[in-house]
């Protein structure tokens, strides 16, 4: 199969992109912290709306819920659209990922996309979530850096997908990985300077 071929028609592709983007742009971290009376999560820690920064509020249950919902919006977008074929699922999944990163409701300033990345992976190639989790947990146990764990895990996934014959999906996740790394550029700089916050720290 040509990994660069695209059989899905333009109207269907656009519909999947819009559906995925709108679903992915729901800022669950911000919504949940405000509902819990914890204020604006963008004003603490890294300023991110994702689960890692929500954890810095000290509310582990809220952080876990944010992680779950941010992942599920990626899963829902990819899985529902996949009923019309893998390309539809890929389009919706990518759009959900981008929606989380650049939500229209927050002036296009969103999260870094790791949870939604996992969710899209679950919706398209579920077994690969086990590899992602294993890589993330191994690096986290050794380093206590959530960002480094995510960077390593996202780097592994496209390679593993390609090696197992999922070339087209591997290309999708290579693009998503590149975007995720760009969104983590400040984390990469802090990792290099030794100033990155470790898991469990509020700073």
Curated annotation (Swiss-Prot):
Q: Does the keyword Mitochondrion apply?
A: no
What pathway is this protein a component of? Answer: Lipid metabolism; phospholipid metabolism
> What keywords is this UniProt entry annotated with?
Cell inner membrane, Cell membrane, Lipid biosynthesis, Lipid metabolism, Membrane, Phospholipid biosynthesis, Phospholipid metabolism, Transferase, Transmembrane, Transmembrane helix
Annotated membrane topology? Multi-pass membrane protein
Q: Which subcellular locations apply to this protein?
A: Cell inner membrane
GO terms for MF = acyl-phosphate glycerol-3-phosphate acyltransferase activity
Q: Which Pfam families match?
A: G3P_acyltransf
Return the PANTHER family for the record. GLYCEROL-3-PHOSPHATE ACYLTRANSFERASE-RELATED, INNER MEMBRANE PROTEIN YGIH
The task this protein performs is described as: Catalyzes the transfer of an acyl group from acyl-phosphate (acyl-PO(4)) to glycerol-3-phosphate (G3P) to form lysophosphatidic acid (LPA). This enzyme utilizes acyl-phosphate as fatty acyl donor, but not acyl-CoA or acyl-ACP.
This protein's name: Glycerol-3-phosphate acyltransferase
